[in-house]
Amino acid sequence: MTANEFILALDQGTTSSRAIVFDRAGTVRGMGQREFRQHYPRPGWVEHDAGEIWQSQLEVAREALRNAGASAADLAALGITNQRETTLIWERATGRPLARAIVWQDRRTAAMCEKLLHDGHGRMLQERTGLVVDAYFSGTKLAWLLDHVPGARKMAERGELAFGTVDTWLVWQLTGGAVHSTDPSNASRTMLFDLHAQDWSDDILALLNIPRGILPRIAPSSARIGETLPEWLGGSIPIAGVAGDQQAATFGQACFTPGMAKNTYGTGCFMLMNVGDAPVASRHNLLSTVGWSLPAGNATHATYMVEGGVFMAGAAVQWLRDGLGIIQRSADIEALAASVADTDDVFMVPAFAGLGAPHWDPYARGTLVGMTRGTTRAHIARATLESIALQSAELLSCMNADSGIPLSELRVDGGAARNDLLMQMQADLLGVPVVRPRVPESTALGAAGLAGLAVGFWSSLDEFGAQWQAERTFEPAWPADVREARMQRWRQAVELSKGWSRPAAGHA
């Protein structure tokens, strides 16, 4: 085995830590995965143990190397991708976390966000950061930690405290505290980062009463930022790529030109579209975010995305399984849905937790409409599957409108992307090809790609992109009038779901 033959990607997710060894062809050569504990100390609170994140990530990195038959000497570089927005603080001198990490799903700062909106800061925050004001993002989580963890604010003011998202925490640990760094894709999810200035916003830091000194420096997503301590993985490895998970997946899917987009089908769906070298202000309350930044001579060049999310995708299928008992396993839905030719005009709006973009109605609730005595469990299964494709098509239409760039094709990944019927539905509703890649590990591959570019493992974006291959392409079969009629019927069903749980006398 020759030196510098592989790239190691660390993929630190919400429920598990993973590590994957890739070769130059983008093929998986070894993998490790460990789940870790979720903490729910109060309703709406979600926490992770920072030490467990680090230990689980270190264990799976060693496991991936063993499974690949590789050592640190065989690695050209290491890349990191991570669950975004999750917020940590630790003592600079010791690396000791002062509290558990507040996870992106955690809602404890919802009231703080409502106050920011009530006080008239919403427009400024959205214009600067590209984000809607929400407890989802790191800024209010960090403010909460400084105000509620004993001694945290005084330590921050004395310069003794460090803040980071999960990527920053892992880099700190891997380098023994030598590097306190993040990248623009993660920084742009904090609600503290000015998209236009490509730096932390002093105005927002003042608004949230956060000392700038606790923030990490911002390095390009593809750049050699430090080296691992030899004791961790048996040798010193350059850390050369960092990106948030959804942006890394977009990079791994080689969506390098404006108009290219990917959709990750999981519990929910995450859609990102490349909009080029300037941020796009959404008219549909989609998020504007940095995809990645690459060195360009003495400067860096950022690529921007618009992002939309579907709350309930695979989760709606799980409800059919666990709530209704219509299927025994989630995988059973494809055969059941395929046993009927269509939904017989049945629509399922899976607004179990409200509706996200472009509707943003927290009072909407799950709705099944169009049923007759002839409706069967197969029709309901097909309508549920189709709801995933309908929601995604609606969001991608908004992305087209915001960006002014027509979608050329949709690249897909995630567990539900293996469902051939769903992928065909998606192509029919979009009117463009839906393409599933040969390598399904898009997120980790993106981190590997960013790291590999920084050290010359791949010489260019074109060379890295050339290893991307389609496993299957789903071509649209519906004419435009059929597609539009289906979308119009869907919009009718969505309107019926809105406002249902509003705590007022009447319903919307």
From Swiss-Prot:
Its EC number is 2.7.1.30. GO terms for biological process: glycerol catabolic process; glycerol metabolic process; glycerol-3-phosphate metabolic process. InterPro entries: ATPase_NBD (IPR043129), Carb_kinase_FGGY (IPR000577), Carb_kinase_FGGY_CS (IPR018483), FGGY_C (IPR018485), FGGY_N (IPR018484), Glycerol_kin (IPR005999). Belongs to the FGGY kinase family. It catalyses: glycerol + ATP = sn-glycerol 3-phosphate + ADP + H(+). The gene is glpK. Keywords: ATP-binding, Glycerol metabolism, Kinase, Nucleotide-binding, Transferase. The lineage of its organism: Bacteria, Pseudomonadati, Pseudomonadota, Betaproteobacteria, Burkholderiales. ADP binds at T14, R18, T267, G314, G415, N419. It comes from Bordetella parapertussis (strain 12822 / ATCC BAA-587 / NCTC 13253). Coiled coil: none annotated. This is Glycerol kinase. The keyword Signal does not apply.
